[in-house]
Regions:
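Nucleotide-sugar donor-binding patch of glycosyltransferase catalytic domains
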Residues: 221-270
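Active-site and donor-binding regions of nucleotide-sugar-utilizing enzymes
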Residues: 1-78, 202-205, 220-221
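Structural motif
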Residues: 5, 111-113, 213-216
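Donor-binding and catalytic core of enzymes assembling or modifying cell-surface/extracellular glycoconjugates
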Residues: 12-19, 129-242
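Short loop/turn segments at strand-loop or loop-helix junctions that form parts
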Residues: 36-37, 110-118, 147-150, 235
């Protein structure tokens, strides 16, 4: 048998990009054993407790249910992630077949995700007035659905980056006209999304006219894997991925801008 064995880093983006990388070579193997890297959980996520471990197992079970994947708990495998790909080439994830179901709403809408990772808060503050004005005008044409956290719980990993790098823009967009607020009350950095809410949010993104994200965190990774996505991202630990897959690419489904005006123009033209 030709067998590949890998552990996966536990960030949402890491899991999605690892899945895409492994999918790109899966026809070369009889079996691909995948395991969560629980050392990452112990170091950065342990305050989330058992519910987060259960959520990770659910996500692995959903994404790696087909052949040649075999779920494992073995911790001796080499670890891969979005930033440490081993010998694999970065590939854009596509998770629509795993999470897209019937429409949640029977009218057109645009999703705005509230969590930001990577783009410094001062850059969002420079963008905020134009961004809110653009969305206010857009709300005359589409409902605006808010997804994500109202308040980001600062776990051990987030504290390393700080609240100027990982934060929520909820207070900036919560009072937009024609808003449908599906944000989470809980601080997901120190709790865990429920399976029901996670699947609902992904399906909501999938059927949106577009999903808007700031930064390069899990919300962008999920959106770009399942929806038409308009993003603004400057700096951040995901820039390697953005540069390789999205910046200056002819991808009709995902745009990532560093120019605030260009970003807002894309939104205005929806």
């Amino acid at each position: 048998l030709n067998v590949l064995k890998r552990k996966l880093c536990l960030g949402i983006g890491d899991i999605l990009y690892s899945k895409a990388m492994l999918d790109s070579v899966k026809n070369e193997y009889d079996e691909i054993h995948v395991s969560p890297d629980w050392a990452i959980y112990d170091e950065y996520c342990s305050e989330r407790g058992q519910p987060y471990m259960d959520f990770i197992r659910f996500l692995f079970g959903r994404l790696f249910s087909d052949k040649p994947y075999i779920l494992s708990n073995e911790q001796s495998f080499e670890t891969i992630s979005a930033l440490h790909t081993g010998n694999f080439k970065l590939v854009k994830p596509d998770i629509r077949k795993y999470f897209t179901k019937e429409r949640v709403f029977n009218f057109p809408y645009v999703v705005v995700t509230t969590k930001v990772r990577g783009t410094p808060k001062y850059l969002f503050k420079n963008l905020e007035e134009l961004f809110v004005e653009t969305l206010t005008n857009l709300s005359k044409k589409y409902n605006i659905v808010l997804l994500g956290e109202r308040l980001v719980g600062m776990n051990k990993e987030y504290k390393i980056h700080g609240s100027n790098i990982i934060y929520s823009i909820y207070d900036s967009v919560r009072y937009l006209p024609n808003v449908l607020d599906l944000t989470a009350y809980s601080e997901l950095g120190i709790t865990s999304p429920t399976q029901i809410d996670f699947c609902r949010d992904l399906n909501t993104m999938a059927h949106s006219v577009a999903t808007i994200a700031i930064g390069c965190g899990g919300n962008f990774c999920l959106a770009s894997a399942i929806a038409n996505t308009i993003a603004y991202s400057v700096h951040g630990d995901g820039e390697l991925v953005l540069n390789a897959l999205y910046r200056d690419k002819e991808d009709p489904t995902v745009s990532v801008d560093i120019d605030p005006q260009k970003f807002c123009d894309r939104i205005a033209n929806l």
